[in-house]
Amino acid sequence: MGDWGFLSALLDKVQSHSTVIGKIWMSVLFIFRILVLGAGAENVWGDERSNLVCNTNTPGCDNLCYDWQFPISHIRFWVMQIIFISTPTLVYLGHVVHIIHQENKQRELLKSNPMAKSPKYTDENGKVEIKGSMLGSYLTQLFIKIILEVAFIVGQYYLFGFIIDHKFICERSPCMRAECFVSRPTEKSIFIIFMLVVACVSLALNVLEIFYLLCRRISRRSKKCRQAMYNGESRYPGHFTTELESMNGMRHNEFNVAFQNKWSQRKGSLDAAKPEA
């Protein structure tokens, strides 16, 4: 686990600049990926090559058949997966550190020059609010993590599958049709399924976090619009009432004019008809 210390320390710093769902994703990464992989994977997969037995006398067939069946070790594959999945988060952390550094300078400048621009993304405690360019950066790293998660899940399926059989038929020359037997296939299959479930949970959390951020942004915008409308009504309380009254008055006047014109026409026709009688 000592090899994971540096990565864990970096990812731990991201938690204070993430949403609630992002913190849950980080916990899943720490506990169910890094911790489980570091503590249990070596015990389960430590004998994957040494205990592979093929029923052939051809020298080197054990190595050839193992390389044919498992192009990359499961442990190395999962280590690569964790590193690639964590990279977008670390890039986002770099962006956060840059923003904090820039706004600390602005805060110092604000003390000597009250007319200077106020910090936009951070408060006095250095806590970052996810909005504007920070929101774009956060959503970008989420989309990249989703793509990488899907790519590794599909890649694992095509490389190994999700279940390990107790034996396989080697198809690599000169060991064609040799039967090879894998040690502890059930235990390995359970571990593979566990890591697959964790990857799917991480993927679902990333998708859920995107919807959460978008819904929160929409909610904030609608709240600002309602606040702006309220401020406009409170600033000009009689404006909307006066406008409505004026419109009603105009309609009433138009109705009166039309009625008078029609009455004048009828009266004129009656006056014209009297001499003839």
UniProtKB/Swiss-Prot annotation:
It is a multi-pass membrane protein. It is found in: Cell membrane; Cell junction, Gap junction. The chain crosses the membrane at residues 20-40, 77-97, 144-164, 190-210. Residues 2-19, 98-143, 211-277 are cytoplasmic. GO terms for molecular function: gap junction channel activity. Keywords: Cell junction, Cell membrane, Disulfide bond, Gap junction, Membrane, Transmembrane, Transmembrane helix. It holds the Pfam family Connexin. This is Gap junction Cx32.2 protein. The gene is cx32.2.
